[in-house]
Regions:
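Rossmann-like dinucleotide/flavin-binding elements
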Residues: 542-563, 604-613, 627, 631-635, ...
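Catalytic cores of alpha/beta
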Residues: 65-68, 355-371
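Ferredoxin-type iron-sulfur electron-transfer modules and their immediate structural context
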Residues: 320, 326, 331, 377-378, ...
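N-terminal capping/small domains of soluble enzymes
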Residues: 1-234
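Glycine-rich phosphate-binding active-site loops on the catalytic face of alpha/beta enzymes
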Residues: 76-86, 245, 362-389
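Glycine/Thr-rich beta-alpha phosphate-binding loop at enzyme active sites
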Residues: 23-38, 245-345, 380-398
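A short, basic/flexible loop-to-alpha-helix module at the beginning of a structural domain
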Residues: 39-47, 436, 521-539, 645-660, ...
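Beta1-alpha1 glycine-rich phosphate/pyrophosphate-binding loop at the start
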Residues: 456-466, 503, 507-511, 537, ...
């Protein structure tokens, strides 16, 4: 597959725009185009933009369709992608070149087109916007600004190629592309109501009146000044000079990023030493401002360029990449503050560097505009994020630029150091991709449900809860989840981590809504709960913890006879007996147990069960061993207290605890967090410290539990391993992190140094294991580590939950119970529920909305199980198209528009890369042969050259040899997008 893009000819581009708008009301995938209805305008370079923002020079301003899509979203200031003397195939760009999962990184730079192609693209976009702005009622024909960008040295900028580019954008009227666009427009006046040939002739060919200068790292200040002076005096262009965050100095940048959690972002001081220095910059900018004023022009700064960092983990190809997005915001906003203070607020700034929905209006209110964006548009929603921003900006008071409000700017700069949006989480994000290949057809997937071990129908119950139908919501939950009250309280909710909303604002309150439904819908649901039949199975369940309770629920609901043997006096296992009350109330456990009683489950309490063989001999048809992980982990340090034993005592007999003032917990899982928080609540305790041989980022504890412990005052000592405990002192060895182990975490290595901590009680929270002796007594086959070899031990004996996995989560125990129940019964115990309403689902994609009341949170759910389209939205070039087939969105990749940036691969929930793995349309046979993608190209005889599963053949689009869904998608693509065959 080639990474060379094929610009769309103007007639085909306009055909797509007009057809899509008439059919769907959308423009190049922007589903609800922004209409500037207020009529308000700003003044910039003698032009009158309707809004003060738009896409930055980069992936969203390279092709005509990118600029048009941005305009449709409400952008009215377009910073065109930089051109330089190296272009086209002479400019190699490593691929993939973009990684925007959290903060952004890239290894691209100037346009990948040739300079003449770039000129054509910008002229096409300018002309197209002149046509559609008024025709579609989006705004005034002169309501937008194009700002060209050039680099990187004066000699290159003075070459004939770049000079022709600059002059062509200053006056495009004599360019072949302008003339071709004008001819097309005059031949299609009927497509634009009221448009006349005279009006077309009156379109201003002055595409750009301003320019942004980009220079390479290490460019001497004298060269920067020479280029800027040339652009001002010789080219008579309003000029912005792009500055680097390195102006802040290495120490400030390093300390700031460290304080915000980016200590592992690697860079040294060489760029800081070689780049423009602040002491040289300010006098230069004073001189250039004076020169601009003498020419009747504006001089300002573009803040800022991306930030160069080292590639250390193979994130992208090469040795150095450029950081953007939320991590760049604190640096760039402080650079803006520093420079504006030096100029007493009089310096004009074009801002980029982490701008997004959350800070855009504050920048504008401070007098910092125009503002350009990149990283936020690379995330789900893409260009559809723009209308919300445009509306917010248009609601502000428009005033002429008279200077920057330094107090507002300083407040923004200070806020950037404390706002959690710009801080990296304590722990790395969980993987958001599954381990499956994306299918060619029907790939929409809800990552929340996919990440859930029991695949809860989350959007369905969220919708029902939002409608106040809590009993129905609980019914949907209980079809797959036997413990709604327990999981609604303490589930580790991987669904929340997987929620696509994480890429917008805040994840949905999935667990909270589950608990809400379990509490408000419980009594009516319980009243109606009954076995669905009468089955012959008699199942003995050994252990009444979460696994045993869940298995009993699924079996009894289906009509099986179930008996639970529980050693203690109540069901719940570790959840009831160990997990502190401040995490889950006992009445939540009681409600889940009450459902078992309603289903007729027999519960034998305070009883140790017979062996599996004996139970089978006594008439049970099946035995399930749900006896937990009873073998407690040890540090093997004399005087240690086991965390489980401590938590049991703290929960059942808190008055008997005498643990002293200084408590140390060794370990870093959720049990360690529970033990530390419980110890803090014991009278007489002065402080609690967790020691861990790695760092917080490697801790196995959920980040939520870690943050709760920190908030309550638990101290953390990283890189310490306990070695001895005596005389109220704990001696620990200092550790350092080495290479990653098989789990991906960096292995701790000894340093030979020790440290001593005050310690009255040492609590060991170092994991539990299944009880190998008990399991062996029940005939369970064990591996070399003493763990069961399989969940299904025989046709009649099963092991599940912690007894199978070791310490695991409640929802994993439920997943084991589901699978076991279905094997015992020979039927599925689950139903599939899909949210019935798709109203506004598409409109929500792009809208940022912070979490509110949990029961109203469905308004933020995007229904990813029905409509995903992440790959469509995040592609700057519109290379992934949504084709609706039988009421479902399918995705077709358009080869000629793709430059293999890799952004769609980042946000696809599958392990795949849509630009490589989805069904692909090729413009001709040469492009088809240059790729291994599944897909097709149309031949002049009306047949298609097809590739599927590695096989190539000629076929009619209705060829029965084609899979029916693929054939239908190919036909529908050509019907909905006939311009593809013409381009």
């Amino acid at each position: 597959m080639s990474d060379r893009m094929r610009p769309i000819p103007f007639p085909e581009l306009m055909e797509q725009i007009l057809t899509e708008y008439r059919r769907d009301g959308s423009v190049l995938g922007v589903r609800a185009p922004y209409r500037h209805e207020s009529g308000k305008r700003l003044e910039l370079f003698g032009e009158k933009p309707e809004t003060p923002f738009g896409p930055a020079a980069g992936p969203h301003t390279q092709l005509a369709q990118n600029l048009i899509a941005a305009y449709a979203g409400g952008a009215r200031f377009m910073e065109l992608k930089t051109v330089q003397k190296l272009d086209g195939e002479d400019l190699p760009v490593s691929k993939p070149c973009i990684l925007a999962e959290a903060e952004g990184y890239n290894v691209e730079w100037s346009t990948e087109l040739t300079v003449p192609q770039a000129l054509d693209e910008y002229v096409k976009a300018w002309f197209a916007l002149k046509l559609i702005s008024a025709a579609f009622g989006l705004g005034a024909r002169d309501g937008f600004v194009f700002n060209m960008s050039v680099g990187y040295d004066l000699a290159g900028i003075r070459t004939e190629k770049l000079d022709r580019f600059i002059e062509g954008l200053k006056d495009a009227s004599q360019t072949p592309m302008w003339q071709a666009c004008a001819a097309w427009a005059k031949a299609h006046l009927s497509d634009f109501e009221g448009l006349t040939a005279a009006e077309v002739d009156a379109f201003s060919p002055q595409v750009c009146r301003s320019i942004t200068l980009s220079t390479l790292h290490g460019c001497p200040p004298e060269e920067i000044e020479r280029i800027a002076a040339y652009l001002l005096k010789d080219k008579h262009l309003h000029t912005f000079v792009k500055c680097n965050p390195t102006l802040l100095g290495y120490t400030y940048a390093r300390e700031t990023l460290n304080s915000l959690g980016y200590a592992d972002v690697a860079f040294d001081d060489h760029h800081f030493k070689n780049d423009l220095q602040f002491a040289d910059a300010v006098p230069m900018f004073v001189r250039l401002s004076s020169l601009a004023q003498s020419q009747g022009l504006t001089f300002g700064l573009k803040l800022s360029n991306t930030f160069p960092v080292k590639i250390t983990r193979g994130e992208l190809p090469g040795e150095e990449m450029y950081m953007s997005g939320k991590a760049l915001w604190p640096l760039t906003i402080h650079l803006a503050e520093t420079l504006e203070k030096a100029f007493e607020g009089e310096l004009r700034v074009s801002y980029s560097g982490g701008a997004d929905t959350h800070n855009l209006t504050e920048l504008f209110q401070a007098g910092i505009w125009p503002v350009t964006l990149a990283t936020t548009l690379l995330k789900p929603g893409g260009y559809n994020r723009l209308p919300q921003m445009a509306r917010a900006l248009a609601a502000q008071e428009y005033r002429p630029f008279t200077g920057v409000a330094l107090d507002r700017l300083s407040a923004l700069a200070q806020k950037s150091l404390t706002d959690p949006r710009y801080r990296r989480p304590l722990k790395p994000a969980l993987p958001r991709k599954n381990d499956r290949d994306v299918p060619l057809i029907d790939c929409s997937l809800a990552p929340c449900s996919d990440a859930c071990p029991i695949h809860q129908d989350i959007s369905a119950y969220m919708e029902l809860a939002a409608q106040g139908r809590y009993t129905e919501a609980l019914g949907v939950i209980c079809d797959k989840n036997a413990l709604p009250n327990i999981t609604g309280s303490i589930c580790n909710h991987r669904c929340t981590a997987a929620c696509v909303r994480n890429q917008y604002d805040d994840p949905l309150s999935i667990r909270q809504v589950k608990l809400l439904a379990a509490e408000r819908g419980f009594r009516p649901y319980l009243d109606a709960l009954a076995p669905v039949g009468d089955r012959p199975e008699r199942v003995a369940i050994v252990g009444g913890g979460p696994a045993g309770m869940a298995l009993a629920f699924f079996l009894a609901r289906a009509g099986a006879k179930v008996t639970i043997f529980e050693e203690k006096n109540a069901l719940g296992g570790v959840v009831r007996n160990v997990i502190p009350e401040f995490r889950i109330a006992c009445d939540a456990i009681d409600r889940d147990a009450e459902m078992l009683a309603k289903l007729g489950v027999q519960i034998v309490r305070n009883t140790r069960a017979e062996t599996a063989q004996t139970l089978l001999e006594n008439g049970f048809t099946h035995v399930a061993l749900c006896c937990g992980a009873q073998s407690r982990g040890k540090l093997n340090i004399p005087g240690e207290t086991n965390a489980i034993a401590f938590l049991e005592q703290a929960k059942r007999y808190p008055d008997t605890l005498e643990i002293g003032a200084h408590i140390v917990v060794a370990g870093a899982g959720n049990t360690a967090m529970d033990a530390a928080r419980a110890a803090l609540r014991v009278p007489g305790v002065a402080d609690v410290t967790i020691v861990y041989r790695r760092t917080k980022r490697e801790m196995p504890a959920e980040e939520e539990e870690l943050n709760l412990a920190l908030a309550e005052g638990v101290r953390f000592e990283e890189l310490l391993a306990p070695v001895s405990f005596a005389d109220a002192k704990l001696t620990c060895e200092k550790m350092k992190l080495g290479a990653p182990d098989e789990s991906g975490r960096r292995s701790p290595e000894t340093t030979g140094e020790t440290v001593t901590l005050p310690c009255d009680t040492l609590i060991a929270a170092v994991g539990e294991k299944p009880d190998a002796v008990t399991l062996a007594e029940n005939g369970v086959k064990l591996d070399a580590k003493g763990r069961p070899t399989a969940r299904k031990q025989s046709e009649r004996v099963y092991v599940l939950g912690d007894a199978l996995r070791g310490p695991a989560t409640v929802v994993e125990a439920i997943a084991d119970a589901q699978a076991t129940a279905e094997e015992i019964l020979g039927i599925s115990t689950r139903k599939c529920h899909c949210a019935t309403s798709d109203t506004e689902l598409l409109a929500r994609r792009g809208i940022e909305a912070e979490a509110g009341a949990p029961d109203a949170d469905f308004a933020r759910c995007m229904g990813c199980d029905k409509v995903c389209l992440n790959c469509v939205d995040v592609c700057p070039n519109r290379a992934n198209e949504a084709v609706w087939l039988n009421g479902k969105p399918q995705v077709v990749h358009i080869d000629g528009r793709c430059n293999e940036c890799g952004n769609c691969a980042t946000f696809c929930p599958y392990q795949s890369a849509p630009y490589l793995d989805k069904l692909t349309f090729f413009v001709d046979e040469a492009a088809f042969r240059d790729s291994g993608n599944p897909g097709w190209t149309m031949r002049k005889d009306g047949n298609a050259l097809v590739r599927l599963d590695g096989r190539e053949w000629l076929a009619a689009l209705n060829d029965p040899a084609l899979p029916a869904e693929v054939s239908a998608l190919m036909r529908e693509t050509m019907r909905q997008m006939p311009w593809l065959a013409k381009a």
